[in-house]
Amino acid sequence: MASTGVSVIVVGLGLAGLTTAIECHQKGHSVIALERSKDLNYVGKIIDDTVMIDNNAGVIVSKWGNGAVGQALNAWKFNNTQASVYDTTGKQVQTIEVRKPSSNKYLILRRELTKIVYDHAKTLGIDMRFGTEISDYWEESDQAGVSANGQKLQADCIIWADGVNSKGRDSVAGSSLKPTHSGYAHIRGRADIASLKGNPDAQWILQGAGEVDQMIFVPGPTACLTIVTCGGGRNVAFSNMYKVESPNSAKTSSTPATAQDFLKPIQSWPFKANIEAVVQAAPSGSLVDEPVLQLGQLPSWVSPQGRMILIGDASHPSALNSPIGESLVIEDAAVVAICLELAGKGNVPLALRVAEKIRYVKQSNNNKNIPRASALQHNVEQPDQGINMYPEVPLRDWVSEHNSQEHAYEEYDKVVKAIRGGKEYVATNIS
């Protein structure tokens, strides 16, 4: 592709950073990507939970490498459109619609997705530097830069994709707002389906394995479990989102967990033995207990001089058990790369402000229902009280069927006109 002359420093090499680096490279920008972890295995949350890539993100990544990435993802296509809800006795009480069929929807292990995306970035020759600690950063009217491992690096802009505890947030957003504990945490892990086949207590999760993916919710007064099968019936992943007794003093970083930690909040459930059969099959040392952090609405994602922008969890961490967080991160990456392409080297601050305008309102609307849904899931009544239906919070078409790339090209000039005219940009593709 032709070079745009735009140079970009991407901070963070989780899914947000990797996707940003790839999208910027494909648009002809020069990219250096920095990651403090020593290698890919230590980046962010590379654990054995699952990631839902919905159609809005699948249409982006499946095209990479002339379809090679899509081919690699095919083994993880999500072919189920319904979720089953069980009560704490093990009785199925509800079926809810969760997705429309699509060839670009994937339910994949996080580590597998990260590896596929990273391998593609390597084939493109992107400059990715692990073990890089940023000690300082700055912006001027014509450039931005970082001091990393004793070296100064400069570029036309910095894209901060370094997660909920972003190093650049204070200066970029002009806010001291810090993530706080939500009052919830979740323990996550996975197991091989093959390891469950001889256990009679695990047969309930094996129904249809290899034919259709299973998605099961078990809400209760002390925890809300999500159990899914994926990869053509090869894997089962599970999550226990539980209430934290003292969130103000609770840990704010991930720690190793055990099967007993996972089971502790559900000791009184009659369904416990069947759940335990699945959880105990997880490889030793593979479970992680992670606090769910939340961040209020930032006043801005773009720095005062327009040379730095926050994307992904650095700007809008997905609340609680959102199934769409990773898909929105991929959209962010695609949009900022397109805006830099259209604006060109001489208008980088404008490009970042346009990208913010296009994404800001949409992300705000995406997150409105998620805290409410999570609270409802922990207030589902139990059989002895009369079952209260599990809340359905549909993934609206303007989210799952959105084409962020087409939309960015269509809206770019409108947003530029609004910014230059000092008017508010009004998004029309949300409801």
From Swiss-Prot:
InterPro entries noted in UniProt: FAD-bd (IPR002938), FAD-dep_Monooxygenase_BioMet (IPR050493), FAD/NAD-bd_sf (IPR036188)
UniProt keyword annotations, A-Z: FAD, Flavoprotein, Monooxygenase, Oxidoreductase, Signal
Binding site for FAD: E35, R110, D313
General function of this protein: FAD-dependent monooxygenase; part of the gene cluster that mediates the biosynthesis of the indole diterpenes nodulisporic acids (NA). Nodulisporic acid A (NAA) and its chemically modified derivatives are of particular significance because of their highly potent insecticidal activity against blood-feeding arthropods and lack of observable adverse effects on mammals, in particular the tremogenicity associated with the paspaline-derived IDTs is not observed.
Record's signal peptide: 1-21
Pathway linked to the protein: Secondary metabolite biosynthesis
Cofactor(s) the record lists: FAD
GO molecular-function terms, A-Z: FAD binding; monooxygenase activity
EC number: 1.-.-.-
Name of this chain's protein: FAD-dependent monooxygenase nodY1
Family: Belongs to the paxM FAD-dependent monooxygenase family.
Active-site residues from the entry: R188
Organism in which the protein naturally occurs: Hypoxylon pulicicidum
Gene3D superfamilies: FAD/NAD(P)-binding domain
Lineage, highest ranks first: Eukaryota, Fungi, Dikarya, Ascomycota, Pezizomycotina
